[in-house]
Amino acid sequence: MDIKHHYIEKGNGFPLILLHGNGEDCSYFEHQMEPLSEHFRVIAIDTRGHGQTPRGTAPFNIRQFARDLLEFMDGHNIEKAHILGFSDGGNIAMVFALAHPERVEKLILNGANLNAKGVKPSVQIPIEIGYRIARMFASKSPEAKQNAELLGLMVNDPNVNPEELSQIKCPTLVIAGNKDMIKDKHTRLIAQSIPGAQLSIIPGNHFIANKNPETFNQAVLEFLL
């Protein structure tokens, strides 16, 4: 593996892996570590090119991040885990569950999306404009190249067909804010496409784990316990 992940860990028991969103790092879950660690061994990872985890030389896309997660679990002797992913982290978790179902006990998808069309236009259009501009200057500026890669995740990934989600057999919770930047009908499509998935819409925007942690944590624990 071309990188070594930075991560924070707290608690004992069955592993619960937390995956942050685009441009974030493991500190996003500051309001989850303590309450969730009362029941689980909670591991929050900085994904490739985020936080203190280096960019490395491998491709910078959701499927590579899912491969990275597999290597992280193998390297830390984690045979199976609950996986909670937020935003792009939710997309990583979704792709990982499809590729390695035997490694996922329960799955939580928070603010995930199948493709760029799942994001409200008021959010997605500026992202796509920023992506085009960053690509224009990527060869001249390391900062522009980094921005192009990060924005590219939200323009080009994960491109999962909803029919594929029928292959996810583990218990799944799909959770989002009632004012999320992900379209409500898109979140519901994800939940409806996964057999037996639970859907929870709670007050808040895209960042409910950080902005409405008490309600979010309650929903997560009710699902996991």
Where are these regions (language model features)?
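Short beta-strand/loop motif that positions the catalytic acidic residue
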Residues: I168, V174-A176
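Catalytic histidine neighborhood in serine/cysteine hydrolases
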Residues: Q192-F207
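Hydrophobic, aromatic-rich cap/lid helix
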Residues: F137-E163, K179
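Active-site loop/oxyanion-hole signature of alpha/beta-hydrolase fold enzymes
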Residues: E34, I43-L84
